[in-house]
Amino acid sequence: MAMAALRREGRRLAAAPFTSPTPLNALRSSLVSPSEEIGLSGVRSISTQVVRNRMKSVKNIQKITKAMKMVAASKLRAIQTRAENSRGLWQPFTALLGDTPSVDVKKNVIITISSDKGLCGGINSTSVKTSRNIHKLNSGPEKENKYVILGEKAKAQLVRDSKKDIELIITELQKNPLNYTQVSVVADDILKNVEFDALRIVFNKFQSVVSFVPTMSTVLSPEVVERESESGGKLGDLDSYEIEGAESKSEVLQNLTEFQFSSVLFNAVLENACSEQGARMSAMDSSSRNAGEMLDRLTLTYNRTRQASITTELIEIISGASALEG
């Protein structure tokens, strides 16, 4: 609702007439370009009512951005605790099965995690840019690269130029509060519908409200893990573990890989959600400050316009009185 109100104020602002020699886009100035100054050379031609309407619109936008900042801060606190707790879930698997981005495989699936909503800075563009770079680095005559997209914003960008490489699209993942059961269902859906040798999970790792790092986690298929362990590479230490029970080594690796993927994906989704809310909080704070600066400039314009109008009226009264006396 806050975003809809923001759009309504933007349309209202764009429709209002403004006769100053220097046109003013108040919405853009309050949200994007705080450095734009209002031209004051034509204050006499500006109606005080027009300036008051502008001030009212900017105040409404400022109220919306402040509310969105508080909502983002509340969501961030809730998600951040769960994201920190989830790190202890996937780290043992990374220690056991490794995170080996340099392993050469033929079928790469790049899982790009983004948000469903905007007004959160450049986190979605960063994820998409990182995914495209990974796609480019792993390209080759005998290699196949596919995308799995989580989130509307990555979908909107990747569909334009990589539609043929998109294997699966999942949106509205954050419609309900994120939990492990929900993400594990998504992981099962990916494992059942996508063939891969390596899953490259791209997300934004949360560091602080104003800082996030584009990150890639790699999950290998059970076949590649078994091949690498037998070849004595980075996963050669797996043979030192004794497998108990009736299950074969391949079955154990299958189960471990599936659990590793769901755990890593759960952490990645939470980290990206933290980064999203932090970026939105920062963006709305900046927008609120810009709106305050815009109000200061509009107040100055209003006062000068009103002063010019009063001065003009006084001159007309004095001139009329002088004419009558003369």
Curated annotation (Swiss-Prot):
Localization (cell): Mitochondrion; Mitochondrion inner membrane
Signal peptide location: none
Family annotation (InterPro entries): ATP_synth_F1_ATPase_gsu, ATP_synth_F1_gsu, ATP_synth_F1_gsu_CS
Membrane topology value: Peripheral membrane protein
Main location, first listed in the record: mitochondrion
Gene3D superfamilies (UniProt xref): 3.40.1380.10, ATP synthase, gamma subunit, helix hairpin domain (1.10.287.80)
GO cellular component annotations of the record: mitochondrial inner membrane; proton-transporting ATP synthase complex
Single GO molecular function: proton-transporting ATP synthase activity, rotational mechanism
UniProt transit peptide range: 1-45
Keyword annotations from UniProtKB, A to Z: ATP synthesis, CF(1), Hydrogen ion transport, Ion transport, Membrane, Mitochondrion, Mitochondrion inner membrane, Transit peptide, Transport
Family note: Belongs to the ATPase gamma chain family.
Biological role: Mitochondrial membrane ATP synthase (F(1)F(0) ATP synthase or Complex V) produces ATP from ADP in the presence of a proton gradient across the membrane which is generated by electron transport complexes of the respiratory chain. F-type ATPases consist of two structural domains, F(1) - containing the extramembraneous catalytic core, and F(0) - containing the membrane proton channel, linked together by a central stalk and a peripheral stalk. During catalysis, ATP synthesis in the catalytic domain of F(1) is coupled via a rotary mechanism of the central stalk subunits to proton translocation.
Annotated NCBIfam families: ATPsyn_F1gamma
Summary of subunit composition and partner proteins: F-type ATPases have 2 components, CF(1) - the catalytic core - and CF(0) - the membrane proton channel. CF(1) has five subunits: alpha(3), beta(3), gamma(1), delta(1), epsilon(1). CF(0) has three main subunits: a, b and c.
Protein name, per record: ATP synthase subunit gamma, mitochondrial
Organism encoding this protein: Ipomoea batatas
